[in-house]
UniProtKB/Swiss-Prot annotation:
Its EC number is 6.3.1.21. One of its GO terms (biological process) is 'de novo' IMP biosynthetic process. Belongs to the PurK/PurT family. It comes from Xanthomonas euvesicatoria pv. vesicatoria (strain 85-10). One of its GO terms (molecular function) is magnesium ion binding. This is Formate-dependent phosphoribosylglycinamide formyltransferase. Pfam families: ATP-grasp (PF02222), PurT_C (PF21244), RS_preATP-grasp-like (PF22660). Mg(2+) binds at E268, E280. It comes from the Bacteria. Signal peptide: none annotated. Pathway: Purine metabolism; IMP biosynthesis via de novo pathway; N(2)-formyl-N(1)-(5-phospho-D-ribosyl)glycinamide from N(1)-(5-phospho-D-ribosyl)glycinamide (formate route): step 1/1. The gene is purT.
Length: 400
């Protein structure tokens, strides 16, 4: 796009966000910097991106009729999926029937909505290195898969996110519990799972890869630590060998070129020495990439907004996005039931080069990420410690 109108006028450039969490909120803010009219949709009211959008809608995005009705009503110029729980076949049909523009493409949204589509594309079509794996539907298939890939292994529903339904099976004593959890933790309820062989990796990274009008660009690699399959800390840059970085970029380019379109992709990789294995890819900003709010001249959200609008991202012809030095993020978690209230915010921000984002989640029921602390320092270890200290200073209460 080279022309932008005025929001809430007939000339407006309209973008529909399908998913309105904390990542969508940051994308909405970046889009509005260019005068884009942002419409936010999700399955619950007052989601974070809804709080900054021009207007919002609550609907079941897995309902094809409801999704079609929303798109027909809003007539967006761009549809930007921000979560996996969307009836992506509807997006594919609308792209084919009406030329509706889906970011990065409707096919990419469909392939990445579950682990099977993207794993088969990576391993079987593109022949990228991955862990050994089996897809299973029944307990018998599940047990046979464990025998084939070996123990330890990882069991995940094909449709889940943020570690829901995911288990690391370390002995045969874990077999029944891992299956039961996978059948209750997925987005679609009981159903198909992937059993993945365990890779003895040194570390795992997210390589934020931007496809844009000027080519493909890469952010510095992001290291991260997960617990129960969910992001807890991330840092940038992750030290790695030149050979491993080069191979990571080759794998990232292969998978993102195949998915096509413009936008930012979060490519997850396992690394051991100079060896690299593909794990997963998200065709949108990644939670581990929250660190880029302080680590880069353009955050992952700014890069995504610029790329999908056809604007320069500041690193043409395959260049690397400018990095601000060792940086880290630490997730803020709330447990229980109620509306989150934060205390000691000033104490959390006491140290220089420390920042905070509170997501505005309207409610916590069980376990939820409600914010993130961010820090820069002279080393990765110092930045991680500073982010942890800031997180520990905050008090989170849940009010009825």
């Amino acid at each position: 796009m080279t022309t932008f109108g005025t929001p809430l006028s007939p000339s407006a450039t309209r973008v529909l966000l399908l998913g309105s969490g904390e990542l969508g909120k940051e994308v909405a803010i970046e889009l509005q910097r260019f005068g884009v009219e942002v419409i936010a949709a999700d399955r619950y009211a007052n989601a974070p991106a809804m709080q900054v959008a021009h207007r919002s809608h609550v609907l079941d995005m897995l309902d094809p009729a409801a999704l079609r009705a929303l798109i027909a009503s809003e007539q967006p110029h761009l549809i930007v999926p921000e979560i996996e729980a969307i009836h992506t076949e509807t997006l594919v049909a609308l792209e084919r029937e009406q030329g509706q523009k889906v970011i990065p493409t409707a096919r990419a949204a469909r392939l990445t909505m579950d682990r099977e589509g993207i794993r088969r594309l990576a391993a079987e079509t593109l022949c990228l290195p991955t862990s050994p794996y089996r897809f299973v539907d029944t307990v018998e298939e599940y047990r046979n898969a464990i025998a084939a890939v070996g123990v330890p292994c990882v069991v995940k529903p094909v449709m889940s996110s943020s570690g829901k339904g995911q288990s690391t099976l370390r002995s045969e004593a874990d077999i029944d519990a891992a299956w039961a959890y996978a059948q209750t933790g997925g987005r679609a309820g009981a159903g198909r799972c992937i059993v993945e062989g365990f890779i003895d990796f040194d570390y795992e990274i997210t390589l934020l890869t931007v496809r844009h009008a000027g080519g493909t660009s890469y952010c510095d690699p992001i290291g991260h630590w997960q617990q129960d399959g969910d992001y807890r800390e991330s840092w940038q840059p992750q030290p790695m060998s030149a050979a491993a970085l080069r191979r990571s970029q080759e794998i990232a380019k292969a998978i993102t070129d195949e998915l096509g379109g413009w936008g930012l992709f979060g490519v997850e990789l396992f690394v051991k020495g100079d060896e690299v294995w593909f794990s997963e890819v998200s065709p949108r900003p990644h939670d581990t990439g929250l660190v880029t709010l302080v680590s880069q001249d353009l955050s992952e959200f700014a890069l995504h907004a610029r790329a999908i609008l056809g604007l320069p991202v500041g690193a043409q012809d395959g260049g690397v996005i400018r990095q601000a030095g060792p940086s880290a993020s630490c997730a803020l978690l709330a447990h229980g039931n109620g509306v989150p209230v934060f205390d000691n915010v000033a104490e959390a921000l006491r140290d220089p080069d420390t920042a905070l984002r509170l997501f505005g989640k309207p409610r916590v029921d069980g376990h939820r990420r409600v914010g993130v602390t961010l820090a820069r320092a002279d080393s990765i270890d110092a930045a991680r410690e500073k982010a942890r200290v800031a997180a520990a200073a905050l008090t989170i209460q849940l009010q009825a």
